[in-house]
Each structure stands twice: as C-alpha cells, then as structure tokens.
Amino acid sequence: MNGDSRAAVVTSPPPTTAPHKERYFDRVDENNPEYLRERNMAPDLRQDFNMMEQKKRVSMILQSPAFCEELESMIQEQFKKGKNPTGLLALQQIADFMTTNVPNVYPAAPQGGMAALNMSLGMVTPVNDLRGSDSIAYDKGEKLLRCKLAAFYRLADLFGWSQLIYNHITTRVNSEQEHFLIVPFGLLYSEVTASSLVKINLQGDIVDRGSTNLGVNQAGFTLHSAIYAARPDVKCVVHIHTPAGAAVSAMKCGLLPISPEALSLGEVAYHDYHGILVDEEEKVLIQKNLGPKSKVLILRNHGLVSVGESVEEAFYYIHNLVVACEIQARTLASAGGPDNLVLLNPEKYKAKSRSPGSPVGEGTGSPPKWQIGEQEFEALMRMLDNLGYRTGYPYRYPALREKSKKYSDVEVPASVTGYSFTSDGDSGTCSPLRHSFQKQQREKTRWLNSGRGDEASEEGQNGSSPKSKTKWTKEDGHRTSTSAVPNLFVPLNTNPKEVQEMRNKIREQNLQDIKTAGPQSQVLCGVVMDRSLVQGELVTASKAIIEKEYQPHVIVSTTGPNPFTTLTDRELEEYRREVERKQKGSEENLDEAREQKEKSPPDQPAVPYPPPSTPIKLEEDLVPEPTTGDDSDAATFKPTLPDLSPDEPSEALGFPMLEKEEEAHRPPSPTEAPTEASPEPAPDPAPVAEEAAPSAAEEGAAADPGSDGSPGKSPSKKKKKFRTPSFLKKSKKKSES
C-alpha cells in the first residue's frame, strides 16, 4: 500500500429535484370570474348544467337546418304519395329507437336469440305499435290479444325457443266466427309486433293481413286447427322445437316424473307424428290422443305442444314442459338410464298441488285471484316493459305499491278563496247585520280551508246502481294537534313490567267495579266511631240523594233544618229560662192592653191586625223532653221548637215585634177595614186558638205602646223587648196579604 495515501473524501452529486407535477389549481386562475362563479354555484345547478352539456348534441341535431329541411321534404312527400310513405315509417322507427330507454344490464337469455343482439345494439322494436288509424279497425279485446301474443313471441325468442321462421303460437280471437291470430310466415320472433299478426279462419284463409305483405304457412296451421276444432275450451296453442324437448320426445319412456315441473303438467299425451298433416285421419288421431283434459302433447321425434284456456296458461305449461325436458335430458346423461332414477308418486303430488282457481301467493291488501300462469306472465311483461318493449299489457295487480300521502290533498288549505269580506272603499264601521253576515262567511271559509283526515275511494258498480259511488274512509295517520307522549306520568328509572302490572290491575278494578277509597290507615283501624245521627233523624227533601246502605229510613220534609240540633243541654236550658222570663213580661203587657181596651169609648174601632200566615205549633209539639245523659243523648231530641206557650191552654203566646209596634202608631187606613170585614175561611180549631193570641197581643201593644205604661214616650226610647228568632219572623208583606 502507498504510505502517503490518505482518506479520500467521497463526494456525491447533488440530489436531483423531482420534476414539478402540474396540479389542478396550477391550471386554474383563482381570480378568474368564471371560476369564481362556477365554484359558488349550487350543486344542483351545476348538475343541471352538466346535463345540458350532455344533451347539447341532440339539441344541435334537432336545431340543424339540414334536419329541418329533410323533415319538411318528408312531410311534403307524405302529402304527395299517400298515408304510409316509406320515409315516414322510417322516421317513426327512428323515433321509437331514440325514445326507448334501454338499461345497461340485460337478463341473460337461456339460449340466446336475435333479441339479445338487438338489445346489445340498443335497439328494441316496440310490441304495441297500434297507433292512430291502425288501431281503429280492431276492438279493445283484439288489441289486447294482439299485444299478448306478440309479447309471447318476444319471450319465446328471449328464452331460445325459436327456430328461425318456423313453429307457431296462435290464439283464438272470436269463438263465434272462429278467427285466430298467427305470425306471418317469414317473420322472425324478434320482429313480431301487434300490428304484424295475421287473422285467419279455421280453414287457414286470411281475414286480416295486418301490417305486412307476408302470407301464412297453412300446412303449419293444420295442427293448430285440428286442436281448436276438437277442444272448444282451448284459446291458445303453442308448438315449439327445442333440443331437450326433441330428445325427450324420442325416448321410449317418455317424460318421467322426476321433477316438480314434470308433475305440474298433469296427464301428458303422446302422438306419433309423421310430418306435416295432409289428411283428415291424422287430425282425428291427434284429437283422440290429446283427449278432453290434457294440457300437454308430446309429438314423437318432433317437438312439444301445450294448450291453455288463455295465453298465460299456455305459457305456463310450455315453460314447465321445456324445463322438465331439460332436467330429464341432463339427468339421464349423468345417471346412465331410467332404472337409476328416483321417480315421484304423481298421486301424492296431486293432493298437494294448487287448484287452477286458487290464488298464488297472498300479499298485503286484497290481491286478485290469479289464474294459472297469470302471475308469472305478468312478471315477465314487467321485465319487457322495463327493457323498453312497450308491451301494452293490462296489469291486473301493480307490483309497486303507491305511497299513499300521509295527509290527504283536501287537508291542504286553499291558497285563494272566492269570498271577500270587505272592499277597499268600505269604511271601518259596519252595521250589526253586516257584521253577522261576514261572520257566517268567515265560518264557511274556515270550514272550506280546514282539511279533513279522510280518503276518498271509488266503489264500483253494483246490482242496485250502475253509477260509481264515492266512499270516504277514515285515514289511519290522521294529523292531531298534540301528540300523546307514552308513559307521561311514569317516574324515571322504573321497571316497565311493574308499570304494566299496575296498569292491568287498575283496568281489572275498573272492569269489576271494586274501586276503594285507598289503603286503610293503620293508626285509626281500631278506633270505633259512633254516628252522631241515629236512625230516623236524617231529614231531606228527596230519598234519592241518600245512600240506602247507610240510611234506609229517611224523613222527607219540605221545611228547613232544625237550628237547635247543634245546641247542648246547658244551652237549651238557658234559652228556655230566657224565654220564660220574656214570656212573663209579655203577659203583663197583655193585661195592660185589656184594661186600656175597657177604658176606650165603644164607638172607637179597634185596630185590626191580620192573622199570621202560618200557624204556630202547640205546646206539646214545641217543648223538648229533657233527658239526663251524656252529650251524645242530645242527638235523640226531636227536631222541634222550644216551648213558648203559657201554662193554661186558653192563654196563647204573643211576641210583639218592632214592626208591629211601629205599625200600631199609624192611624188605620181605609184599605184595612174591608180586610177585617172580609170573611176568612174556617180553619182548624187549633190554628184558630193560636191566631187569637197574637191578635190580642197586638191590640194590647197598640193601646199601650210603652212598656212602662207611659204613652208619651217615643218609640226609640221604649224598653227593649224580646225579639223573636229570625226563622219565626214573617215579612210585612206576608202579614198584610
């Protein structure tokens, strides 16, 4: 090694910078007004502009002068050449192709066909091409049959059942005239439309050629005519040649019951087919082999035939027959022979199979009762319509449920009403009559604008009336002003099961009527409480307001309650003494009045006083019987007034009232004299004695108004007399009456 060698310094080239990658914002000027306008644009508006850019090419074609000139020339050519020029038909086809919406994904056909090629190109010929004057020549039933049969041909092409221009599917149009629809000979299944079908009779003669110039394969229709002649119930006949069907028709064992599709066909008929039918003996033999009930006929070494009472039923049987043949052909190829197969018992399957009139599947609501094959055929028609075929099929039951509005249209208030309340020229004041009229208008407008939570449904025709009637039914989701909060009064953090148990318990109590006042107090449960009222002392004006369980015997009285029932024995005794003391003073006044009356001259009339309106009870009815006992015995007293009568029965009580004393100073009015002279009705003896006492007392009070015998004293300085209780006072008006 070299001794003067030293550590070398390794120098690396400077790192190369990565090339600048152009970004989106490098190409955009943020200060550009166009960029700012597009950035601030709403997403929906930006999407609309993008759609307009995509449709710009179509708009350019429609707005081009060349297109307008060509269209005008074709219209002028139509006026010159007639109804259906070739250019107009071509333009109509172009319009059909452009307006048809073809999805990006198509269902894969089992065997393929010409329709698959057409769909891949994005061009589909519509099935229902009956437009304008073409549809006038056919009635509604024939139009529907033409659309169904043409759609059936399209399905056969999609499933791969077609064999170039051969094989036929026919349907009966009219049973009386024996007219049938068949495809023109030379037209592919993918080209068949409703207007291109040919109408023929039972002998094969053309009745209506349709929209084509092609004829009919009468030799091919011979098989169909033989079946139609033998089976009046048959409305549709299908004759196809499939590889699997031809393979099964060549087997000696025939169609084996190894699949549900094979068992769903029922009794299968066989016929040794020897080519095109040329003689009548062959027709009779076919009719004999088919029988009156068979729906499926296998032509030996030739093909398959299915019949049905409708187009849908014929499609159902031919579809199951083709599937059963494919299953059998593949099974025998893998099993090695019929002896290695497990056969099903047709008798057991027949008991479980659905009848022709039973509905297939039940959905929500009330779906129609499907016939055999109708539900499957309708589903395939929806598929064709989604692909853009425009089948014109009348759907019996829509697959998609229409979302019913939560609130009916009539619930939306009217934006404009035809009622005006005040005009511009009116003043603020109005008459009461006009105000009332405007109030009626406001009520009517409010009723018109207020929605109703009902839904209208049209009822069909019935036997009684041919008109349809509108029936209003209550809507389920009717709007309410306030929403009910569930479990509003349930405390938080509670067990839901306990709440439900308590709710059920309350409901049972309500049903069994065992409501109580609540839990019984544990403190007062042993205390025995005596009733303050005993039996027979409850006074009321009606027995209906008294519970019979507690008061079975009630005293009915129209007078008021006794005010002395609440007083004790001591208070009653004091009151009795006070009454006796006041009574002695009244007796002295009565004696003075008698003396004054004797001294008065005989020609001076006595001042008359009307008797009281109501009699006073006798002594024995007024004096309570004093009893000795505790305070509870006070409740046993009879509800009567205290004793206010003197000891002698001849002497009556009289209570001088202040009103009577003031009236005594007045001179007798002339109106009072006839009152005294008027005869009074003869009352009972007891009230007469009672009425004499107050009159005598009043006469004494009139003779000597002063209590101390001085007639010169003023009434204000009189000695204070005992005043009767308020319940015994009689008004001045009653006393004068």
Curated annotation (Swiss-Prot):
Residues 1-21, 419-490, 576-737 are annotated as: Disordered. The keyword Metal-binding does not apply. It is a peripheral membrane protein. One of its GO terms (molecular function) is calmodulin binding. Residues 419-430 have a biased composition (Polar residues). Residues 715-737 have a biased composition (Basic residues). Keywords: Acetylation, Actin-binding, Calmodulin-binding, Cell membrane, Cytoplasm, Cytoskeleton, Membrane, Phosphoprotein. One of its GO terms (biological process) is barbed-end actin filament capping. Heterodimer of an alpha and a beta subunit or an alpha and a gamma subunit. Membrane-cytoskeleton-associated protein that promotes the assembly of the spectrin-actin network. Binds to calmodulin. This is Alpha-adducin. The lineage of its organism: Eukaryota, Metazoa, Chordata, Craniata, Vertebrata.
